[in-house]
UniProtKB/Swiss-Prot annotation:
The lineage of its organism: Bacteria, Pseudomonadati, Campylobacterota, Epsilonproteobacteria, Campylobacterales. PANTHER family: 3-ISOPROPYLMALATE DEHYDRATASE LARGE SUBUNIT 2, HOMOACONITASE, MITOCHONDRIAL-RELATED. Its cofactor is [4Fe-4S] cluster. Disulfide bonds: none annotated. Belongs to the aconitase/IPM isomerase family. LeuC type 2 subfamily. The keyword Amino-acid biosynthesis applies. This is 3-isopropylmalate dehydratase large subunit. The gene is leuC. Its EC number is 4.2.1.33. It catalyses: (2R,3S)-3-isopropylmalate = (2S)-2-isopropylmalate. One of its GO terms (molecular function) is metal ion binding. It is an enzyme of class 4 (lyase). InterPro entries: Acnase/IPM_dHydase_lsu_aba_1/3, Acoase/IPM_deHydtase_lsu_aba, Aconitase_4Fe-4S_BS, Aconitase_4Fe-4S_dom, HAcnase/IPMdehydase_lsu_prok, Homoacnase/IPMdehydase_lsu, IPM_dehydratase_rel_enz, IPMI_cat. Keywords: 4Fe-4S, Amino-acid biosynthesis, Branched-chain amino acid biosynthesis, Iron, Iron-sulfur, Leucine biosynthesis, Lyase, Metal-binding. [4Fe-4S] cluster binds at residues 300, 360, 363.
Length: 420
């Protein structure tokens, strides 16, 4: 029996001819990632294990993005600990205030991760890089510590689910609608410890940003990882960024999948995940009138330049609704700068939105937009659990940037076509 894309990457890095689901393997890593929340725990474990060196200073990335710029003394202390570790071990890819971005937007942008890589990160949304045809997954801080020291990690080879993408998305429907549609279909445990493998003729109609968004939320379906077939769009993106050679892994024609889903992109409508689970999805006709207090456009899911562009298009010459707050967060400094160059920031500010420096901030209820009791927020982030963005009685509605921007203008949950 043949292997899937994920299985081929794992077999290669484990030095094996083949692997099967449920095999336990040790595999060599191409990148180990941590942030300002998870890295301090990894550093403590690193020291407790009495490790004396890192395996490769060029294959570790530390990104201060969650509570940065530091929101309080504890956050500052954690960042200082990471800063000292990066200096002591001469870590090449250390990003702090000034060059920092939201990690899962920053690493692909900078070419630090690329096609065919095996990546672990002490952050659950590390699965984002599967958009590039990499095997990428989140781990705990202890595994991060061992990875930094040895360059290896253990894996249980996952079973696979295949998603055949067909057709083309409608105007103002994007990758966020696709992944919310899928999660609504299979549930938050529908891909539990599985690899979600995306391909099909519809792939050519999805941008890299669409794919990054979709892969980012594979974890919200319980997946071990999400991974996309590599095509000309992927290769063009990678060649413009990475300085490393890369290898493309293609699934065998006789690869085995537990399930196969055909996803008709043409039929997907604006989709929103209602509180308090990403699987609690509703399409536009079923939304009803939901009055909102806040909109957040940004995060590792939807803080990329294309997201800023569509938000600016919708907000151009419009005004944020009275009694509605709109917070926009470009995910990296380069995206922020390009927003300035293209006039997006002027559009946002004239509309009545506030623009933040890159940060994860409100997504995890950290800072830059915490919700009070009973407040409702439309957000382009990836989780809407109870209390995720603030008070336990607040509500988070997960949406695309298109829906978020339209909702900010009307003050109620809306789609772009609802704006006169």
């Amino acid at each position: 029996m043949g292997m899937t894309m994920s299985q081929k990457i794992l077999a290669d890095r484990a030095g094996l001819e083949s692997v099967r689901p449920n095999d336990l393997i040790m595999a060599k890593l191409d990148m180990v990632l941590g942030n300002d929340i998870t890295t301090p725990v990894a550093i403590n474990a690193f020291k407790e294990a009495k490790f004396q060196k890192v395996f490769d200073k060029d294959k570790i990335s530390l990104v201060m993005d969650h509570f940065a710029p530091n929101k309080d003394i504890k956050a500052a202390t954690q960042s200082a600990q990471c800063r000292c570790f990066a200096k002591d071990f001469d870590i090449s890819h250390y990003y702090d205030v000034g060059n920092m971005g939201v990690e899962h937007a920053l690493l692909p942008e900078q070419g630090i991760v690329t096609i065919g890589d095996l990546i672990i990160g002490a952050d659950s949304h590390t699965c984002t890089y599967g958009a590039l045809g990499a095997f990428s997954t989140g781990v705990g801080s202890t595994d991060m510590a061992v990875g930094m020291a040895t360059g290896q990690a253990w894996f249980k080879v996952p079973y696979a689910i295949k998603f055949n993408l067909k057709g083309k998305l409608r105007p103002y429907v994007s990758g966020k609608d696709v992944i919310l549609h899928i999660i609504g279909k299979i549930g938050v445990d529908g891909a539990l410890y599985k690899s979600m493998e995306f391909g099909g003729e519809g792939l050519k109609n999805l941008t890299i940003d669409d794919r990054l968004c979709i892969a980012n939320m594979a974890i919200e379906a319980g997946a071990k990882n999400g991974i996309f077939e590599v095509d000309d769009i992927t290769i063009s993106y990678a060649k413009g960024r990475t300085k490393r050679d890369f290898r493309i892994y293609k699934a065998d024609v006789d690869a085995e999948y537990e399930q196969v889903f055909d996803i008709d992109l043409d039929s997907i409508n604006h989709t929103v995940a209602f509180p308090h689970l990403p699987e609690n999805t509703k399409e536009k006709d079923d939304w009803g009138e939901i009055k909102i207090d806040q909109v957040v456009i940004g995060s590792c899911t939807n803080g990329r330049l294309s997201d800023m562009a569509v938000a600016a298009e919708i907000l151009k010459d419009k005004t944020i609704a009275k009694n509605t707050r709109c917070i926009i967060i470009p995910a990296t400094q380069n995206i922020y700068l390009e927003c300035i160059n293209r006039g997006y920031l002027e559009t946002f500010i004239k509309a009545g939105a506030v623009v933040s420096t890159p940060t994860c901030g409100p997504c995890l209820g950290g800072h830059m937009g915490i919700l009070a009791a009973n407040e409702k927020c439309v957000s382009t982030t990836n989780r809407n659990f109870v209390g995720r963005m603030g008070h336990i009685t607040s509500e988070v509605y997960l949406s695309s940037p298109e829906v978020a921007a339209a909702s900010a203008v009307r003050g109620i949950l809306s789609a772009p076509q609802d704006i006169a």
